[in-house]
């Protein structure tokens, strides 16, 4: 099933959202140009020193005069260094397409002003009217600036989200935290809840199992909670296994283009290929290991589920952190544009990775939650092939043996 065939633009939007699958080969070149842009910040009109001057004037105009860095971080949820880097990414697009953006008093908005508006909109989840009132501009200006920012980030920040060419470090970290060998990622799905008119028949496809209208985001995550692959846009009515099987990630793995590295021997007749882990909502596959459902019936099953749970925490916490920091996709969105929403979700994922890549520790002192889908029950998928079940059993036996001899 395709994602909403009645919307002609939908497939184009999804292809754009899942483009990290297609653009991995160009990531290095894009990364180099972005690094050059970052290194040239000293020569930019928006360099660090001038950016400090901008915050001084901006904060006095909007927030009553506090120029404390902590105030900046509480407003935008990122450090000044990260903010300046994001400005450097979008500068070319914002200046190449001049627009007469101004506040309510007719004062032109600088690059930093516009990035601030977009980040506040994405980070706070506040309505266009509230953002407009806060920043002293009309709602349409807030909307146009935010969308231009989203379009620019899709292109300029794509190198921050791509499948890695080497997985050794990722596998090593997963084994260190969970004891699972050859694990390359953790997968999970979260719901972006929307308020849609229930009387419209076309909206029924968005109605999920918890009676919410929602759109899904599927993410594969590394041990550092960094997104490696994402796809957004499928209706919440679809089960996790259906979303998975319609994703670019699934198709690439099935074609042997992902998770195709070194295999580890488990026994004389069984090898453990590269794989990811996911909860019981996903099918048990040779490359996707899920936990034993119900109450474990043996020590090996108990040991496997324990280790599996440690590995899957990365995906759960990453999605929780994403929705907590970029609150436009948290809570309930009021009648969003369903063609644009997947692209907004994708840019929030890019921003999430940028914060990690910049080693930005803003808000790191806040406790991490594993709950990213409040009031959603865990659903179970019964799909499993015999070979995958045998593989999981042999891995469980080996893990239990290692544990016993430790």
Curated annotation (Swiss-Prot):
Record keyword Nuclease present: yes
Compartments where found: Nucleus
Record has Hydrolase as a keyword: yes
InterPro entries found in the cross-reference section: HARBI1-like (IPR045249), HARBI1_dom (IPR027806)
Group of enzyme by EC: hydrolase
Cofactor: a divalent metal cation
CC annotations in GO: histone deacetylase complex
Gene Ontology molecular function terms on file: metal ion binding; nuclease activity
EC numbers, comma separated: 3.1.-.-
One Pfam family per UniProt: DDE_Tnp_4
Family membership: Belongs to the HARBI1 family.
Role summary: Transposase-derived protein that may have nuclease activity.
Protein name (Swiss-Prot/TrEMBL): Protein ALP1-like
Organism, scientific name: Arabidopsis thaliana
Origin organism lineage: Eukaryota, Viridiplantae, Streptophyta, Embryophyta, Tracheophyta
């Amino acid at each position: 099933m395709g994602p909403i065939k009645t919307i002609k633009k939908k497939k184009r939007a999804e292809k754009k959202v899942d483009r990290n699958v297609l653009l991995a080969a160009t990531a290095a070149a894009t990364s180099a140009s972005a690094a050059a842009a970052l290194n040239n910040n000293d020569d930019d009109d928006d360099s660090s020193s001038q950016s400090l001057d901008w915050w001084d004037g901006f904060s006095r105009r909007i927030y009553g005069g506090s120029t404390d860095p902590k105030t900046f971080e509480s407003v935008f949820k990122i450090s000044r260094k990260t903010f300046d880097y994001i400005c450097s990414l979008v500068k070319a697009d914002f200046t190449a397409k001049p627009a007469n953006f101004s506040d309510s008093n007719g004062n032109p908005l600088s690059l930093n002003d516009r990035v601030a508006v977009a980040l506040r909109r994405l980070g706070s989840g506040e309505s266009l009217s509230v953002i407009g009132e806060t920043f002293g501009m009309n709602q349409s200006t807030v909307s146009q600036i935010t969308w231009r920012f989203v379009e620019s980030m899709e292109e300029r920040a794509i190198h921050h989200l791509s499948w890695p060419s080497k997985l050794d470090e990722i596998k090593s970290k997963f084994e260190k935290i969970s004891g699972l060998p050859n694990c390359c990622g953790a997968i999970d799905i979260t719901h972006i809840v929307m308020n849609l008119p229930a009387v419209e028949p076309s909206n029924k496809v968005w109605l999920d199992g918890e009676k919410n209208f929602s759109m899904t985001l599927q993410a594969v995550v590394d041990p550092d909670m960094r997104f490696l692959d994402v796809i957004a846009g499928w209706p919440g009515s679809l089960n996790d296994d259906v979303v998975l099987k319609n994703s670019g990630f699934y198709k690439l793995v099935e074609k042997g283009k992902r998770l195709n590295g070194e295999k580890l021997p488990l026994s004389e007749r069984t090898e453990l290929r590269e794989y990811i882990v996911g909860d019981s909502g996903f099918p048990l596959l040779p490359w996707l290991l899920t936990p034993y459902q119900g109450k474990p019936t043996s020590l090996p099953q108990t040991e496997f589920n324990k280790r599996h749970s440690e590995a899957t925490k990365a995906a759960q916490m990453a999605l929780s952190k994403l929705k907590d920091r970029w609150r436009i996709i948290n809570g309930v969105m009021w009648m969003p544009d369903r063609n644009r929403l997947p692209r907004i979700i994708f840019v929030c994922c890019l921003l999430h990775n940028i914060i990690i890549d910049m080693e930005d520790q803003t808000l790191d002192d806040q406790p991490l939650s594993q709950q990213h889908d409040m009031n959603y029950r865990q659903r179970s998928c019964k799909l499993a092939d015999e070979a995958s079940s045998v593989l999981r059993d042999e891995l469980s036996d080996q893990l239990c043996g290692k544990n016993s001899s430790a």
